[in-house]
Every structure is written in structure tokens, then in C-alpha cells.
Regions:
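A membrane-interface helix-boundary motif in multi-pass transporters
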Residues: 156-173, 366-392
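Hydrophobic core of transmembrane alpha-helices in multi-pass small-molecule transporters
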Residues: 88, 98-115, 310-324
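Juxtamembrane intracellular "pre-TM" segments in multi-pass secondary transporters
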Residues: 1-7, 189-226
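Helix-loop boundary and gating motifs at the non-cytosolic
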Residues: 2-54, 220-258
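Structural signature of the two symmetry-related core transmembrane helices
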Residues: 76-91, 286-301
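Multi-pass alpha-helical transporter architecture, strongest
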Residues: 174-185, 385-413
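Helix-to-loop junctions at the C-terminal end of transmembrane segments
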Residues: 59-73, 270-284, 368
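Intracellular juxtamembrane helix-capping segments at the cytosolic ends
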Residues: 114-127, 324-338
Length: 413
């Protein structure tokens, strides 16, 4: 037992993080993009579908939070979202039409992202205030572990080219299998509400507008949110297109790509823990600035590198930088936002990340298509990396005037 909370409920919640990363890595990051491009879809079509599904999630996530609060039960919504994602992923394993596959991918991605919102909101159900951070950390660790194990469990079912479709059905089944403990053992407390007060949902939209206006009174915070949009735009895109770039621009084999992704995941753990240490020692804003410079160097190397052997070094570098970025940038927000508005501005922080996930894939895809039209062939992907470098550079320039968090004074307009 964890206090009055059954240990099986805690383990069930942690297991769900293990489960959902099997989907996100195998479908979103690893197999769907290369497979659908081999089937004849354009980069622009793929980017548009990723952007559209991200936009749907950005629009519905505040409403989903309100609905779950109003109903008083989140687990039923988690089950519905998970089953919808599993069903769409199973469909990907059987579908023949490119456009049907794109639609199923969009549905799976929306259901997956919506499920994450509900899943995160279940953390207070399986934890107490004093152990919440520890249990959340176990979930993150289980997620990294699930990504690596899921990658290699599915690998025997996925061939090359069109045979990559074989990855989707086992991925769906593994997601469902490891999600079952959460479905079975998490018990929500409190009274069930009978209906949703949609006036509260409209209030969320009104509050979002007020939050954006409110952020204007804090110039440093506003600068940081805009900078985050720019660098998150690049990083969210990298997560989605890394396998495509490794295959098409560098010439890596499927086995090599699996190793590259596994290395990046392992080193993301190192980056997360190491980033936390340096944040405490040097300050979050300073660490984030150094990390963004690291991104510029790493992507610059990736843009010009042609050796498959040398490209293996890019995976660990990206992993470390991803872990350190997400560790440091959320701390920057806590230093810049007034304590009484921290939740409000974390919502804006999250929205910036979601919108970056919409814009980034579109910009990437449009750059690839335009460059290919200009006759650059697979070098078009290198040009697209150059655009990501520009986005991170702009984000870095926007961050520089923000004072270090050890001496932050929040100024009002």
C-alpha cells in the first residue's frame, strides 16, 4: 500500500506510461512516416496530417480537462481514448489505401494525445502530495523503458519498405496489454457527477484568452513563451522525422535506425538527470541557453554529415539535448511566473508546445517539397534541417534578454 492507496493502483498508473510510449515510438517516431512515404504519400500530406491531428488535440485538450473534472471520473475517458488508439493502430496494420492509412494515423494520434491528458490528471489519484514527484518520476522512467523494449519487441514483425506495416498490429496489442493494469486497478475516489456543465467548458476558452492578455503584463515571460514556441517547433519535428531523415538523407538501414533511436532514448535519461543537476548549480535559464547552442551544433553536424557510422553519434547527442531541454525549460517558467498564476501560465506553456507541434511538421514538409521541386532530391531533407536550425537560433536570440533565474525580477507593463 502507498498510504491508503493500493500499490497495484500505483503500479497500474506507472505501467500505462510504459504502454503508451510503445505506441508513440513505434508508430509516431519509427514506422509510420517511412512506411507511408514508401507507399507513395508526399511529405506534405504526412506533415499536414500530423499538424491537423495536433491542432485537434490543442483545441480539445482544455475541454477534455473540464469534462473529466465535471464527470468526476477520468478512468472511463482513459479507457475510451486508449481503445480508440488501439483500434486505429490495428487498422493501420490491415489497411491498403494510403489516404485511409493517413486518416487512421490521425485518429490514433488524437486518441493517444487525448489519453495522455486524462492519464496525467490521474496522478493525484495514485499518489499523495509528499510522494507525487517520486511516482511521477517512476512513470517517466517506465516510459523510457517501454520505448526501448517496445522497439525491440516489435522489430521482428517489421520488415523493410512496405513490410514495415507489420509493426502496427503488435504495437497495438502491446499498448493494450500493458494498459490493462491501469484499467483494472486504479480506483477513483469522490462522487461521480451525472452530467457536464458546458458553461464551465466555455469558461475555459474565456480563461485562455484572459491568460494570453495577462501574459502581456510580464515581458520576460512573454519572451520566454515565444522562444519556447520556436525551439519546441524544431524539437517536436525532430522527434517525428528523425527516422525519415536517417533513412532518406543519410542512408541508414532499418536496423541502424532502431539502434539510433534506442541510443537517443537512453541518453535522454542521462540528459534529464544531468540537466537537473546543472539547473540547480547554474540556473535554469543559463542551462537552457547552453542546451540551445548544443542543438545548433548538433543539427549543423546532422545537416552536413554523410557517413552512416558517424551519424550514430547524433542519436546520443539529440537524446541528451532533449532530456536537458525539457528539464530546464519548465523550471524557467516557474522562475518567471508569479506564484499565484503558476497554473495559468503553465497552461500557456503547454499551449505553445502544442501549437509548435502543429506548425513544425508543416514547415518541415513544405520545405522538403519545395526543395525537391527545385531538383535537390533527398538533399531536400538537409535543407529542412537548416530551417529547424533557424527556428532554434531565433528561439535562442529571444531567450537571451531573459534574466537568469537567480536574479529574476518580474516586470509589469
Amino acid at each position: 500500500m502507498t498510504g491508503s492507496i493500493p500499490l497495484v493502483a500505483v503500479l497500474g498508473w506507472i505501467a500505462y506510461d510504459f504502454a503508451n510510449t510503445i505506441f508513440s515510438l513505434n508508430v509516431v517516431s519509427r514506422y509510420f512516416g517511412p512506411w507511408i512515404l514508401d507507399r507513395g504519400a508526399s511529405d506534405l500530406a504526412l506533415g499536414a496530417v500530423i499538424a491537423a491531428s495536433g491542432l485537434v488535440v490543442a483545441l480539445v485538450s482544455p475541454l477534455l480537462g473540464v469534462v473529466s473534472d465535471q464527470l468526476g471520473r477520468r478512468k472511463p475517458l482513459l479507457i475510451v481514448c486508449t481503445l480508440a488508439c488501439v483500434a486505429a493502430t490495428l487498422g493501420l496494420g490491415m489497411v491498403g489505401s494510403v489516404w485511409s492509412a493517413l486518416l487512421l494515423f490521425a485518429l490514433a494520434n488524437v486518441a493517444y494525445q487525448a489519453g495522455l491528458i486524462v492519464y496525467d490528471a490521474l496522478l493525484p489519484v495514485v499518489s499523495r502530495t509528499e510522494n507525487r514527484g517520486r511516482i511521477s518520476g517512476f512513470g517517466v522512467g517506465a516510459g523510457y523503458l517501454g520505448a526501448v523494449i517496445g522497439l525491440y519487441l516489435v522489430q521482428p514483425f517489421a520488415g523493410e519498405g512496405d513490410e514495415r506495416q507489420g509493426a502496427f498490429i503488435p504495437t497495438a496489442l502491446l499498448f493494450l496489454l500493458f494498459a490493462l493494469p491501469a484499467f483494472l486497478f486504479i480506483r477513483e475516489r469522490g462522487e461521480r457527477q451525472g452530467r457536464v456543465a458546458w458553461g464551465a467548458a466555455r469558461g475555459v476558452i474565456r480563461q485562455l484568452r484572459e491568460t494570453i492578455d495577462h501574459a502581456g503584463h510580464y515581458p520576460n515571460l512573454r519572451r520566454f513563451i515565444l522562444s519556447r514556441f520556436l525551439y519546441a517547433d524544431a524539437m517536436n519535428t525532430i522527434i517525428v522525422v528523425m527516422a525519415i531523415y536517417a533513412e532518406r538523407a543519410v542512408g541508414m538501414s532499418d536496423t541502424g535506425i532502431d539502434s539510433l533511436l534506442a541510443l537517443s532514448i537512453v541518453f535522454a535519461v542521462v540528459g534529464g538527470f544531468g540537466g537537473g543537476f546543472f539547473v540547480e548549480r547554474w540556473g535554469a535559464r543559463r542551462v537552457l541557453g547552453v542546451v540551445l547552442v548544443g542543438w545548433l551544433i548538433t543539427l549543423g553536424l546532422a545537416m552536413v554529415m554523410t557517413s552512416v557510422t558517424m551519424f550514430y553519434a547524433i542519436g546520443p547527442m539529440i537524446g541528451i539535448l532533449l532530456g536537458a531541454t525539457w528539464t530546464s525549460d519548465r523550471v524557467v517558467l516557474t522562475r518567471l511566473a508569479p506564484a499565484e498564476h503558476i497554473g495559468e501560465f503553465f497552461g500557456l506553456y503547454g499551449l505553445a508546445g502544442k501549437l509548435a507541434g502543429v506548425v513544425g511538421p508543416l514547415v518541415w514538409a513544405a520545405t522538403v517539397e519545395i526543395s525537391r521541386f527545385a531538383g535537390l532530391g533527398h538533399s531536400a531533407y538537409r535543407v529542412a534541417v537548416g530551417v529547424l536550425i533557424i527556428a532554434i537560433l531565433l528561439g535562442y536570440c529571444g531567450l537571451r534578454p531573459v534574466p537568469d533565474d537567480k536574479a529574476v525580477v518580474i516586470s509589469s507593463a
